[in-house]
Amino acid sequence: MIENWPKKPEGSQWTDDQWKAVVANGRDILVAAAAGSGKTAVLVERIIKKIINEENPVDVDRLLVVTFTNAAAQEMKNRIGEALEKVLIDEPGSQHVRKQLSLLNKASISTIHSFCLQVIRGYYYMLDVDPRFRIANQTENELLKEEVLDDILEEEYGIEDNTIFFELVDRYTSDRSDDDLQRMILALHTESRAHPNPEKWLDKLVEAYDVEGKTIEDLVYASYLLEDVKFQLETAEQHIRKATELAMLPDGPAPRIETLQADLALLGTLSSAAHESWTSLYEAMQNVSWQTLKRIKKSDYNEDVVKQVDSLRNKAKDEVKKLQEELFSRKPESFLRDFQDMHPVLEKLVQLVKVFTERFQAMKRDKGMVDFTDLEHFCLQILSEQSENGEMNPSAVALQYRNKFAEVLVDEYQDTNFVQESIIKFVTKDSESEGNLFMVGDVKQSIYRFRLAEPGLFLGKYKRFTQEGLGGGMKIDLAKNFRSRHEVLAGTNFIFKQIMGEEVGEIDYDADAELKLGATYPEGEDVAAELLCIQQTEEEVIDGEEGAEVEKAQLEARLMAQRIKAMVDSGYEVYDRKNDSMRPVQYRDFVILLRSMPWAPQIMEELKLQGIPVYADLATGYFEATEVNIMMNVFRVIDNPMQDIPLAAVLRSPIVGLSDEELATLRAHGKKGSFYEVMSSFLKGAPLEEEQELHDKLEWFYNLLQGWREFARQQSLSDLIWKVYGETGYYDFVGGLPAGKQRQANLRVLYDRARQYEATSFRGLFRFLRFIERILERGDDMGTARALGEQEDVVRIMTIHKSKGLEFPVVFVAGLGRRFNTQDLMKRFLLHKDFGFGSQFIDPRKRIKYTTLSQLAIKRKMKMELIAEEMRVLYVALTRAKEKLILIGTVKDANKEMEKWLDAREHSEWLLPDHIRAGASCYLDWIAPSLYRHRDSEMLLELGQGSIPDEIYGYDTSWKVEVVDGNTLLAPEPVQEEKQELLEALREKKAVPLESERKDEVYDRLMWKYGYEEATSHRAKQSVTEIKRNYQSEDGSDNAFIKKLRAPIKTRPRFMEKKGLTYAERGTAVHAVMQHVDLKKPITVEVLQEQIAGMVNKELLTFEQAEEIAIEKVISFFDSDLGKKVLAAKSVEREVPFTMMLAAEEAYQDWQGNSGESILVQGVIDCMIEEEDGITLIDFKTDTIEGKFPGGFEQAKPILEDRYKVQLSLYAKALEKSLQHPVKEKCLYFFDGNHVVNIEE
């Protein structure tokens, strides 16, 4: 079958492996695509080749393409569409290609959740679900869970003789709350839903604790821990062997050798026992006895070597002591008793989880909603059926999908979970050797385990499949990287060849996994990768862990700011592939990658201080924003005014504006009771004269508050929020503060959040406040409104997770000295997909607790998985760089850390010892030991090659390794220091001598006058109507502009307003009719009535406006000479908008500024008739004429001419400028009285 694959065309851009991935067929195929290897292009090309295959073309809707995100799915569709359009250019007559383009929008190219949704919509009748279901909001989901769980526990507490439940409560709750028990139930529910059969997985948890008739050797936990014990004993042996080598040196402590050999024999005995059984090792551990070291005269030997030997021996003894205390201080039978004792309690816990799942599903069903895990499980339910022996087999629907899909292609396969794998399995062929499943991914970039992704699925197939595809699936390695320079790739390879292995890291970083150069770059300067390790001296360290973290962030931020500024200022060059040339680096070429975002605000602040534009999509800080915080307190007070802290916050805020003294005065009126009660009491009495202002402020707020509370009971939450914004004027107020637009955007987001909340199944202010609390509890704070867009020339800061799939010319990876987050390992209970449930053994009667075997096994397993995940995260970070990679980390004591890292230099294999890699607590613990074995670290270490093999020491990679003194970074710059001194002098109101060389410049700045002061009182943009009014005013000033700054006059309440349209609204209605009336139809009452009715239907007019139209006046116009001219004309334009620049002195009579100033003028011309000899301009007027002027129209005419002369002159000027055609006639038509006025110049 391989021979039948199309051969790669001559001169093809594809590599051999890429071409194989494009055309290989006839079996399941796994493509291991390294970073930057062009996997998306390969995937698209494979799809195109299948669609346009001459012998066996496949319709695009017979392919299922599963992507990780909706954006990736859309990009895939776009790429396929573009490729098909290119084919169509070469084959314009191809009906097949045209058909594929029409099918593309309906093709199954989507995320797995979108596919599930499609299946459920098609077969909803097979489920107990409302076909009109909606996807639940995450916070709404959490609140529903809380509600269901509260009900279940309340019922359980009310059952008499519920012994096991109360034992469960005693073991896993505190005396204050049952929060821990609730967390356990929810965690078990969530974990179970990551498995195809949640109930089966839960049952296995309970079965694991039923140890009746079993020995400790039968337990999976003991088997796993024994492997770990072997690992630790091997580490202890390595320490003793290293100590022995040192003792044998010419100046080493030779008398120690005999003792060390005895130690090796002891460790050998323990290791042999570990290979036999747990019981054998337990017995051996009881007989451990270390020989006492012989006294030696230290002056006879090298003191440093003696210290190293003794230190290494103590490390080995500590390893064994730790094992003795954790695992072998208790008899094997006592561990079994723990399991048996916990079995009924765990059984009860699992029963509660099952009840919770059932009730939660029922509540969602009643509310017509589903969550994302439901989509997967409902889809699986449709696609599978259970056999008699409990196995899941494909259903009739699944078989239909199997027949429909010619191939299923899965992108980012390494991030698939067990449920998704089952769904894919049911819509593809059974046999891997004859399968139709094409999977693309890179297990080294699997970094979503926290979302329950399972990299083991990829690894299992990678180990099982062969490159030839004989007897099973085929694997193809795409190792060529078309993104990065040699220096980036070689640097990454050098580190990962040393740290990533199967035992520690889950993946062998072998020759197949290494990145291979595929991109071509011109020679560049300063392209070596860098490791900058900042030494944080004792003087710099702020007390407390949090303070130290802030200090580290500041140090690294300052170093990065200096480097970025230096690179930009020096014109550092990067390659522009589009233009095939080098160009100076821009800010947008830099990215700063962080493991998580807590440091981002400090880094942003430091970069801004250096004048570097920076952008970070911060998912925090929204609810901390002052304006949002104040508004949230207002809503808390509306919900419950008896809350003192929120009420005091609102009273002190700009909304009420009390000072500290006024707040104290209010409290002095009632030392007992809540602030609200004191305020109510204060308002009932007559205020003292000096308290009148305080009384007025509180009375104003109190009346508003009562109105809001009443409104909240009857109206929607979103309406309440906007009402509060409007009545307090707070929305407008924050708009006038610095960053006003952003603050207003934050308030609008709060309003939008309320509308989203109202779209859920919850209602009311109280539940909304709880809704927000849940968001904050989950750590899902939103980012504040964006001030800088992502496309601007800015340095970007983002998490490594967010950067996946992106690339940047220059990459800083910062925070490499931060400790890995191991909080999950510290929880009171642990869960694992394979090992189930583990917690401490708690005996409430004896008041004792201790670690169990299951907890130790799960903790160790999770630690190793965490280490592997962090390695993959580091790999993703390093492979984002195209041209320059700079790694930065901070340590408290560089000398001490170096001593630890230098241990790696004694190791002669590529892969560092397991204990070094598994014992890492931060990324630097992997990177530094690796680089300290390379020749480029010599400038720092000056230790020579030593025993490091040539292939490692001289590996073809370029690095700059440097330790940076933190003191030099924190030293104030001279300018800043001078500035600080000046500020301090000014605060103390001292005279400041201007000794600076720039004193003349300072004087000039202080005495400077704005050269365009006249322009500040006149608008730069005017409408024609405003210019007309301006000419009519006495002094020509822009009163309308100034009026906007005046306090508004309160409008009457609506119930007191007179009904009917205003003059302006009537005029607008008439103009609308004149714009839309059909000039080709006869102008009669019936025709006009019909047309006006049509305008109402199209919402061009309101019903009220239509009622006010005087149809006879419209007919009168068309009966006039001017109207007949309009009807007879060949070219008539109506409602013609225009914009033009006008000299300021023409627009403003009082203009005294620069003669070169211009303003932008906008207007709309009602009607124009274009004829060969010129344009007739018509402006319709609805002014009242009849009865207003005693002298009739003859008196009105000169007044009207004067009033509108400027307006029509501007219209004429605009038309003549734009159309290059003269205006021969300017007419005003007044509907009141059917009058025409010709405006002459």
Curated annotation (Swiss-Prot):
Pfam families from the UniProt entry: PDDEXK_1, UvrD-helicase, UvrD_C
The protein's matches in Gene3D superfamilies, at most eight in alphabetical order, are given as: 3.90.320.10, 6.10.250.2380, P-loop containing nucleotide triphosphate hydrolases
UniProt keywords, alphabetically: ATP-binding, DNA damage, DNA repair, DNA-binding, Exonuclease, Helicase, Hydrolase, Isomerase, Nuclease, Nucleotide-binding
Residues annotated as binding ATP: A33, A34, A35, G36, S37, G38, K39, T40
What Enzyme Commission number(s) does the record list for this chain?
3.1.-.-, 5.6.2.4
Q: Which cofactor does it need?
A: Mg(2+)
What is the catalytic activity of this protein? Answer: Couples ATP hydrolysis with the unwinding of duplex DNA by translocating in the 3'-5' direction; ATP + H2O = ADP + phosphate + H(+)
The question of whether Magnesium is a record keyword is answered with: no
Cross-referenced InterPro entries, in alphabetical order? AddA (IPR014152), DNA_helicase_UvrD-like_C (IPR014017), DNA_helicase_UvrD/REP (IPR000212), P-loop_NTPase (IPR027417), PDDEXK-like_dom_sf (IPR011604), PDDEXK_AddAB-type (IPR038726), Restrct_endonuc-II-like (IPR011335), UvrD-like_ATP-bd (IPR014016)
What biological processes does GO assign it? double-strand break repair via homologous recombination
> Care to name a GO molecular-function term for this sequence?
3'-5' exonuclease activity
Q: Which CDD domains match?
A: SF1_C_UvrD
A cellular component term, taken from the record's GO annotations: DNA helicase complex
Keyword Glycoprotein set for record: no
- Enumerate the spans annotated as UvrD-like helicase ATP-binding domain: 12-485
Q: Where is the UvrD-like helicase C-terminal domain?
A: 505-805
The protein's job, in short, is: The heterodimer acts as both an ATP-dependent DNA helicase and an ATP-dependent, dual-direction single-stranded exonuclease. Recognizes the chi site generating a DNA molecule suitable for the initiation of homologous recombination. The AddA nuclease domain is required for chi fragment generation; this subunit has the helicase and 3' -> 5' nuclease activities.
- Tell me which family the UniProt entry assigns to this protein: Belongs to the helicase family. AddA subfamily.
Question: Subunit info?
Answer: Heterodimer of AddA and AddB/RexB.
The identity of this protein, by name, is ATP-dependent helicase/nuclease subunit A
Q: Which organism is it from?
A: Bacillus cereus (strain B4264)
